[in-house]
Amino acid sequence: MAEKAKKKKNGGGGNQRIAFYKLFTFADRYDIVLMVIGTLSAMANGLTQPFMSILMGQLINVFGFSDHDHVFKEVSKVAVKFLYLAAYAGVVSFLQVSCWMVTGERQSTRIRRLYLKTILRQDIGFFDTETNTGEVIGRMSGDTILIQDSMGEKVGKFTQLVSSFVGGFTVAFIVGMKLTLALLPCVPLIVGTGGAMTYIMSKKAQRVQLAYTEAGNVVQQAVGSIRTVVAFTGEKQSMGKYEKKLEIAYKSMVKQGLYSGLGIGIMMVVVYCTYGFAIWYGARQIIEKGYTGGQVMNVITSILTGGMALGQTLPSLNSFAAGTAAAYKMFETIKRKPKIDAYDMSGEVLEEIKGDIELRDVYFRYPARPDVQIFVGFSLTVPNGMTVALVGQSGSGKSTVISLIERFYDPESGEVLIDGIDLKKFQVKWIRSKIGLVSQEPILFATTIRENIVYGKKDASDQEIRTALKLANASNFIDKLPQGLETMVGEHGTQLSGGQKQRIAIARAILKNPKILLLDEATSALDAESERIVQDALVKLMLSRTTVVVAHRLTTIRTADMIAVVQQGKVIEKGTHDEMIKDPEGTYSQLVRLQEGSKKEEAIDKEPEKCEMSLEIESSDSQNGIHSGTLTSPSGLPGVISLDQTEEFHENISSTKTQTVKKGKEVSLRRLAHLNKPEISVLLLGSLAAVIHGIVFPVQGLLLSRTIRIFFEPSNKLKNDSLFWALIFVALGLTDLIVIPLQNYLFAIAGAKLIKRIRSLSFDRVLHQDISWFDDTKNSSGVIGARLSTDASTVKSIVGDVLGLIMQNMATIIGAFIIAFTANWLLALMALLVAPVMFFQGYYQIKFITGFGAKARGKYEEASQVASDAVSSIRTVASFCAEDKVMDLYQEKCDEPKQQGFKLGLVSGLCYGGSYLALYVIESVCFLGGSWLIQNRRATFGEFFQVFFALTLTAVGVTQTSTMAPDINKAKDSAASIFDILDSKPKIDSSSEKGTILPIVHGDIELQHVSFRYPMRPDIQIFSDLCLTISSGQTVALVGESGSGKSTVISLLERFYDPDSGKILLDQVEIQSLKLSWLREQMGLVSQEPVLFNETIGSNIAYGKIGGATEEEIITAAKAANVHNFISSLPQGYETSVGERGVQLSGGQKQRIAIARAILKDPKILLLDEATSALDAESERVVQDALDQVMVNRTTVVVAHLLTTIKDADMIAVVKNGVIAESGRHETLMEISGGAYASLVAFNMSAN
């Protein structure tokens, strides 16, 4: 349903573009000044062409009518005017380019910021139904570039060209009205073709954008859940989805190229036919109306430079089409008024809040699942200062109560009251600031531990942070980390174990010092010892606060002032534990009995933690203890910490990094060409077409010089010659009609294929990186998504537009010099001497612009990560009113690239102005030199114009290429960044086909003398000489303190990492010698925080089986995981979308789907990392039964805090100080007096 709604939204009807002027909605006064100066300068710059044609007319008459002796004197008068024109053109073109580039950068940065700000202020329902992180990042990195392109220098260029057009026609009317009127009908033809083409192009641009946004979602999901993807060997699946989206974009891009070529081709035919007609009709005007040759040429050049200028508006129009299409969705979001607005400052603010909560007759459905009724007349009262616990089955709506109190959603009917006032009447930010939330899956941001904690209170002092950490029992493990509070936690907190993350989240809530406390399974990720200490901290915290607790473990809620049992959308029982336990038939009593049934185990259950406590005490004294604060990742799969382990280490890494990028820059263009090798035939044909297209320019110059000569011939000869040259011009137009569509179409194929190949290869390489690569914050999902979308698009411009232009211009230059030298070698030599000035000017433009791009892009990537983090954790951002904090951080990351953009604008303006200045100065010098040669009888008037037109058209070609410099430079940066990805060689490569495949897998596992440290935390030893043997079919449970490395064992078995020394064997074969994808197929992993993809429930379960599963297999697996009944009760059953990271489901529901996925895989080895921690007692019992059945004849490794699940294990191993301290069956270990395991259990019993 959500999917359908989304599709409808994205692709649905209407013309999805905004009006062009609306792009500038967010301009401030400074921008308006810049745009006015830029526009006036562009208009003035556009008039240089008409002025030049006036001077050209004067010049032609001087050359045509002056006698040889006075030609130099007369020409020098006109040449001085050319120098004035040069100065004028230099200044206005500088102002045009720099003003528009600077304002483009300013406004696009503002749009990025406004878009993120608006996204952050939206109600949570918007994220459930209308957007996701991938889309937001795609829009902020890809779409804003298109918008910036359409509102920067392209607007100036467009204004300049239109001004040239208007100026040209004005001059033509003044000089020769009759001839101009005769030529006028050609103009609508030119304009009409351009308009039709732009319309079609914008349609195609929308299709391309939509496909890329969807491709971005695939990247976001895969990289954000990379451990799940590789554990289920889902790389090919992700690639398949990605390539499907790329194929749609590819087809649209090719059509775009074809239509643009046809449009330009038709336009050029019209232009050249106009030339032909003008020559023929102009000749008649000379004979009949006494026009001069200069007049006719003036009219022709004025109309044609005007008409050509209109033709050249195409790239700008394409840009405007792409920009207005990209802006449509972004501006629509910016304008969206949220139902619950965090920025709305109206609403009540009380001087003091007591904390009485009441839900009165509430009816509620989630926006993403409007067909599932969650609450039907739900009522609950929580007096201030009281603790109320909500219990009930997984999915009964306990967490929904918390969402309604936080005002993430509003009820359909009924009221949520605080202190007797309807929640809707309060100022949203103020009321949220009075509520502290700790959720079941704590969300941390990809920054330091300190930064994560101060989300609770902006200006918290060090002392306050320390106190909060002590209360949350988190200071011990943080003190052991080399960087302490400055340790990076990784994307989604992957560098920490579940328990460590939860304690930081609790510290954050403690720091907020809220009046109302909402605890959603707040201690579910903790081991018994941490849970007891944190529970004590929470009890202190709850004093004189209104607290609502959602819990599965009933031990944690017995002391609550009131317990409410939630079932089928209502409170069906409430009272204290002692009151309700008296009714043996009550639902609460039954729940308690269910857990009592496993009470003995529960005792053990809480146990591993005694060991934890003693370990913590032992190692807290010695900073360098072997276990100095291991960090494991959330999925239990261990991760890493930021690069800045030590200054030296950090610098080494960054210096090698810059070296690679630099090296990449040297080779990138040649390598890019190599990537386009399969399209060599297409490129050759395209280049051939470009060459012919290029030769047309000097040939046109040659024809013009011949034409000028005929205007000074006797009437009878003029009549015949004019018809002949007119037909030659028509032939030239027909040539263009063939070669331009060919050139554009073929280069579009090559460019689109290259983009597709680069995106595909890069994503494939990303998917097959080893996990430690993703542990580096530089490779987070937001950054990778931004790199794939921005870099591939930028690189395409080198192959498509730029390569075509280079071939075309080279042909123009070579053709021009051949024509010049055959005319008069002296004149040509003179032209050759001044030409280098033009080339150097172009070269220096490229050099100047180099060096700004790379740095700025890196910063925008960092900014993308800030946005990605915030959007994927939107509930946490909303709950902690952290919208402003996120915006400040984003702003900080954008400041530097914005400054770079300003510099780039000024430099580009200087170079662009310089090119015009040089062009006209050179022409002036040429006129003087030419007239001197003519006066001295070393050249003729005809030869001079043949050389002159050849030179000017070449110069225009070179200047045009040099304006492409920003594109070439951006593409080089992007290419370096792409080859950075393509060249990274993973140590553990899942794409490798090498390695043995065992004919039969028994499942014997052995870890022999394993030592291990995380690659990015080389200063912390996790294992030192760890040995463990697991026989085939055995169930082995790992216990130990939070962060002792239990989950690291699972990571090593899955080969997410390789040990530093020692061996890991499967059936006596070292796992490093086995084929990696095959090895992972033998293992089924269920992690502590299950990762689901933003798809249907059915496809999430089917993900477990390579090559897809039948409906029957999916249902069987769901039944085994005790999730089939719940799925069947949903209106869309297995077709229900789970939302981003599974937000539409409760923790228990997600976990059961993850278990079904692992069951479907039917693995030989089962790895359960806290697999039932998120389940309530009822679900846990049934899932545990299911797991028990699944474990039969399978080797199983269990990591658990709840010892119910491990008492019956064939072997229990205690992980302590980097080795296995004890191992054996429960009974055996209990007999070791003073043993780690026995003391855990004893501690647990007393705690219970």
Swiss-Prot record:
Subcellular location: Membrane
Pfam families, per database record: ABC_membrane (PF00664), ABC_tran (PF00005)
Keyword entries, A-Z: ATP-binding, Glycoprotein, Membrane, Nucleotide-binding, Repeat, Transmembrane, Transmembrane helix, Transport
Any one Gene Ontology molecular-function term assigned to this protein's record: ATP binding
Limits of the ABC transporter domain: 357-593, 1005-1242
Glycan-modified residues: 473, 652, 720, 779, 1094, 1193, 1244
Transmembrane segments: 32-52, 82-102, 158-175, 179-201, 261-281, 299-321, 682-702, 722-742, 813-833, 834-854, 914-934, 939-959
GO cellular component, one term: plastid
Protein residues bound to ATP 1: 392-399
PROSITE patterns: ABC_TM1F (PS50929), ABC_TRANSPORTER_1 (PS00211), ABC_TRANSPORTER_2 (PS50893)
Manganese keyword on record: no
Membrane topology: Multi-pass membrane protein
Residues involved in ATP 2 binding: 1040-1047
Family as reported in the entry's similarity comment: Belongs to the ABC transporter superfamily. ABCB family. Multidrug resistance exporter (TC 3.A.1.201) subfamily.
Protein name as catalogued: ABC transporter B family member 7
Natural source organism: Arabidopsis thaliana (Mouse-ear cress)
Name of the coding gene: ABCB7
